[in-house]
From Swiss-Prot:
Protein name: Glutathione S-transferase C-terminal domain-containing protein homolog
Transmembrane intervals: none
Gene3D superfamilies tied to this protein: Vaccinia Virus protein VP39
CDD domains according to UniProt: GST_C_family (cd00299)
Origin organism lineage: Eukaryota, Metazoa, Ecdysozoa, Arthropoda, Hexapoda
Alphabetical list of InterPro entries matching this protein: Glutathione-S-Trfase_C_sf, Methyltranfer_dom, SAM-dependent_MTases_sf
Family per record: Belongs to the GSTCD family.
Organism: Drosophila melanogaster (Fruit fly)
SUPFAM superfamilies, A to Z: GST C-terminal domain-like (SSF47616), S-adenosyl-L-methionine-dependent methyltransferases (SSF53335)
Assigned GO CC terms: cytoplasm
Length: 585
């Protein structure tokens, strides 16, 4: 049986009020929407909830709220409960999923009823992309959740939250869906009683017709079909509007959306009524202000979300000016090192005798991939001790993690990846090899809060490498990282550039991004369109960025080696950072 872990906090005063976090509330809401599926057992994890707390109607939870189903997080025997942010979905005994949308999707996907699986949208892709990669998933899983959390922390609104305005604008956008022209033709050729018009009288709609001119409007959050996005957004927006006084009439499309869901079936409203205890609301007199909000799409693929005027275009003069500022640091920017990790070759035929035949990679590319893996595996082995927990961040289909599991049978290897399909492939290969020391976490890096001894990542894209290094510093864990996509570095709420105190003294963020941009000009010598002088400049910029990473780690108490993979031709992005935590600053 699958397990669903939700966080609760029981008040100490007479223990009558039961609270949960916003994300766990959404998972419980989905579970109740599915009518308490019999193949999933709910487990409540007693913890101190951070952020806003939602009071639950405990009368609806009598069946689940027994001592047998309540675990204390600090004393949990299951490591995943301490490793991941709640809610967590467990399946197959060694796979754990964190993240609101991913957990709610899995609740639906694991149901035998095929009709329910239609809630996952076309090809099961609704909210499939992780929040790091999808603005739409981030809106549902992060942005609106943060709004509700603040409201339940006592925030009094002066303005309608910007997220409400963004959703109203989203509902005014043209519908994006598969076969939209087919749907438009069917809609245009239906009679009032639902029948079809005669063939010669049919309205013709060409595929060259702009989508804005098609008479298809949003009924639901993702178009004309009720999906998991509606299940997640409905309780969030209902709660927000409870704190907005009489502001709903100012948002007619959102109001119509509420009505559509309520008329589609009262299940959402009923589940919300059964679970949610409204809090006492303090609203200022009069109407709330409505913030101005630029009309940008909530879909990543929509060209309206790209703002070319805001992008950084690096000129040679700006790059040279940024690099010249570093001269005062009197540092050597290079990756030359006496330490290398490519000498110990691995007998791949012994480890995975059939993988070369089944791999989709061409022979030469497979060889280069294996050389990359050898370097990282050897570096991790040089740091590992029996019993260590080792995390392969951004694991993809698990090539590095599986190699580590084979070479270090006395260590636990955590395979962490936010894409469900990739993690499924990793699990399949692990099962084929009979590995018993792998645990699989489907989640964003930020949802991992557990302890570990070594963190590794091979070509984690852009800022993801710096999030991995941040996780290692948090856990005081050794690290082995081969960075990638330097040009994709972007500041985030918890990551700012430059990283090290030394670089911060001489560079601002814009200077730093000029250098990072140029680091992506490093191509393999002799390849098409490769200018030697540009490639050498790109290699120098790679060394600058990775020296900044090295200095930041040294400031946190690490001994760090910056070297290159061997042979160096195995990848253009061949830098390797190996850090050993030695002291607490």
């Amino acid at each position: 049986m699958d397990q669903l872990y939700l966080e609760i906090e029981i008040s100490t005063q007479k223990e009558t009020t039961i609270y949960t976090g916003v994300s766990s509330f959404l998972a419980l809401f989905t579970y109740k929407f599915l009518k308490d599926p019999k193949n999933v057992r709910v487990n409540f994890v007693s913890t101190k909830i951070e952020g806003g707390k939602i009071a639950l109607r405990s009368s609806q939870l009598k069946k689940e709220l027994t001592d047998r189903h309540i675990t204390c997080r600090d004393a949990a025997s299951l490591p995943a409960i301490q490793d991941l942010k709640l809610p967590i979905y467990e399946k197959d005994g060694n796979t754990f999923i964190a993240g609101t949308c991913a957990v709610c999707r899995e609740l639906i996907a694991r149901q035998p009823n095929e009709e329910l699986k239609k809630l996952l949208g076309f090809k099961g892709s609704c909210l499939l992309a992780p929040s790091e990669a999808s603005i739409w998933t981030k809106f549902c899983e992060v942005d609106l959740v943060a709004v509700v959390s603040k409201l339940h922390s006592g925030q009094v609104l002066e303005f309608v939250p910007q997220e409400v305005v963004r959703f109203e604008q989203h509902m005014n956008e043209p519908v994006r869906m598969h076969n939209i022209y087919k749907q438009a033709r069917e809609q245009a050729n239906q009679t009032e009683n639902g029948g079809k018009v005669k063939r010669r009288e049919r309205v013709q709609i060409k595929c060259t017709t702009p989508k804005e001119e098609l008479l298809i409007e949003h009924r639901f959050a993702e178009g004309i079909s009720f999906t998991i996005a509606d299940i997640i957004l409905y309780p969030l927006l209902r709660i927000v509007f409870q704190h907005c006084g009489q502001m709903l009439p100012h948002f007619p499309l959102t109001s119509t959306w509420f009505s559509e869901i309520d008329s589609f079936g009262d299940k959402c409203a009923r589940v919300l009524r059964d679970l949610y205890v409204p809090q006492a609301i303090k609203t200022p007199p009069g109407e709330l202000g409505i913030p101005d909000c630029e009309a940008t799409s909530l879909y990543k693929a929509d060209p309206k979300r790209y703002k070319p005027r805001n992008r950084i275009y690096t000129s040679q003069l700006e790059l040279e000016a940024a690099l010249s500022k570093l001269s005062s640091l009197q540092l050597q920017f290079n990756s030359d090192s006496e330490h290398t990790y490519g000498q110990q070759l691995i007998d791949w035929e012994q480890i995975e005798p059939t993988h070369a035949k089944s791999s989709a990679l061409p022979k030469e590319r497979l060889e280069r991939k294996r050389q990359q893996l050898e370097n990282l595996a050897n570096a991790v082995v040089s740091l590992a001790q029996p019993g260590d927990r080792i995390v392969d961040f951004c694991s993809g289909t698990g090539h590095l993690a599986i190699l580590l599991a084979l070479k270090l049978p006395n260590c636990t290897i955590i395979v962490m990846e936010n894409k469900a399909f990739s993690l499924l492939q990793a699990q399949k290969r692990s099962n084929e090899l009979g590995l018993t020391n792998c645990v699989f976490y489907q989640c964003n890096i930020d949802y991992f809060v557990g302890g570990f001894k070594i963190g590794a990542s091979l070509h984690a894209c852009g800022t993801a490498t710096d999030i991995v290094l941040q996780q290692c510093r948090r856990a005081k864990a050794h690290f082995v990282c081969c960075p990638c996509c330097y040009g994709s570095l972007q500041p985030m709420p918890h990551i700012s550039y430059p990283l090290s105190k030394a670089f911060q003294k001489v560079l601002d963020t814009k200077d730093y991004l000029y250098i990072a941009h140029s680091a992506d000009q490093a191509h393999e010598m002799g390849t098409t369109n490769c200018k030697p002088e540009t490639t050498l400049q790109g290699l120098h910029c790679m060394s600058v960025v990775d020296t900044d990473r090295l200095l930041q780690a040294e400031e946190a108490g690490y001994q760090v080696i910056l070297t290159r993979l061997k042979p160096e031709q195995c990848t253009p992005k061949n830098h390797l950072l190996v850090g050993r935590f030695v002291k607490q600053n």
